[in-house]
């Protein structure tokens, strides 16, 4: 029986790298995958995942209006060799899209591997993450570390000088130049780096 997996972590833990490796593993065995990326993440263009270590892969762009179950059903009808669905930046999914992913596992018997962060720079949950945490069959934490050596669980937004930003829009695209993964203590203290 297929399952809905949610791989979650703070930023910069290697979620996209893990996703691309999973897709590669299927492809190496002669099985096709569908890889989706919400359009809101256009740092590398709408249809490409790019990792910090230089790996990249093509994706299918998702908008908030994409009927995910229909899209996957149609692709499966065209190519019955599709064996897995993968979603990067899954925190940007809508509730109905997470429902659709659950339906894909239940009705189409395809495993779904979703990768994302749980919370934003204010410690508030993303819509997609809320429902993945509630409905996924398996929750898998991908660990990364804070500058102090503790497990990083939070995402601290920083300005050009490295100062913490506590207010603003929930979504502001950026990587290492705009966000740093911290433990809860250093998130609360607003310390993106080790103080002397």
Swiss-Prot record:
Annotated localization: Cytoplasm
Annotated catalysed reactions: thymidine + ATP = dTMP + ADP + H(+)
One record GO biological process: DNA biosynthetic process
Gene Ontology MF, one: zinc ion binding
Binding positions (Zn(2+)): 146, 148, 183, 186
Enzyme class: transferase
Gene3D superfamilies: 3.30.60.20, P-loop containing nucleotide triphosphate hydrolases
GO cellular component, one term: cytosol
Keyword Coiled coil: no
Superkingdom of source: Bacteria
Major location (coarse): cytoplasm
Keywords on record: ATP-binding, Cytoplasm, DNA synthesis, Kinase, Metal-binding, Nucleotide-binding, Transferase, Zinc
Subunit and interaction comment: Homotetramer.
UniProt similarity note: Belongs to the thymidine kinase family.
Stated name of the protein: Thymidine kinase
Organism: Coxiella burnetii (strain RSA 493 / Nine Mile phase I)
């Amino acid at each position: 029986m297929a399952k809905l997996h949610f791989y979650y972590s703070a930023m910069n833990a290697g979620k996209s790298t893990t996703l691309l490796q999973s897709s590669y593993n299927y492809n190496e065995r002669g099985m096709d995958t569908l890889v989706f990326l919400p359009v809101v993440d256009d740092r590398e263009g709408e249809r490409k995942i790019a990792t910090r270590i230089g790996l990249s892969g093509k994706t299918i762009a998702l908008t908030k209006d994409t009927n995910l179950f229909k899209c996957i059903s149609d692709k499966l009808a065209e190519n019955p060799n599709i064996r897995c669905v993968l979603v990067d930046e899954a925190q940007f999914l809508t509730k109905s899209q997470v429902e659709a992913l659950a339906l894909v596992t239940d009705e189409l018997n395809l495993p779904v591997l979703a990768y994302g962060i749980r919370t934003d720079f204010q410690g508030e949950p993303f819509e997609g993450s809320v429902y993945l945490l509630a409905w996924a069959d398996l929750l898998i934490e991908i660990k990364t570390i804070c500058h102090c050596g503790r497990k990083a669980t939070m995402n601290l937004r920083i300005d050009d000088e490295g100062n913490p930003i506590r207010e603003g829009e929930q979504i502001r695209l950026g990587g290492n130049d705009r966000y740093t993964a911290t433990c809860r203590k250093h998130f609360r203290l607003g310390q993106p780096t080790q103080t002397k």
